[in-house]
């Protein structure tokens, strides 16, 4: 398995110089020096080694009618299990969605005698997890890497296609801090390049121990 991961990583690195030229729109540019290439390699290695994460993140859904913003706590495994709890706004606070990889349940942990509902998966929910981005990145026929110069520092930007031909979820971009190696934000674009979902990470922890009970009722 490790050999396969390294082979995939090597293949992506070999094509890096070919794809950066077409991924520099929207204030992005290609890696300019050895330090930025090294940061990219470290970030890629981090992605391939990620097994679990815990995060506090703001999730914003945008449409032609406006936007809806939620504060969330996320737990996820690369194997597909996840848990997301909404902590704000107050009207949605306490809402929890869990997936054990087979079934998805929703409940509100602020309601006494809570009732759990089995629900269908939706890409609007599943694609907000970093683990989904990593899986798409590994499986994409074409991926790209760019660099963004921001007031807070230099960010490496990874891009991957989202499978399924969803009209509003076409491309995902992940901004990662070159110094901390922590994800800063994940943005999902529609086919016209409009931002549809923006996930902003406030606290992010890699490869934490997650109890199986987090993903079950």
Language-model region placement:
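A generic structural motif
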Residues: 58-62, 85-89, 107-109, 161-163, ...
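Bacterial N-terminal signal peptides
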Residues: 10-18
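Gly/Pro-enriched, hydrophobic low-complexity segments
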Residues: 148-217
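N-terminal leader/targeting segments and the immediate start of mature chains
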Residues: 2, 17-72, 76-77, 81, ...
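Flexible, processing/modification-adjacent segments and terminal tails
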Residues: 27, 31-32, 48-49, 102-166, ...
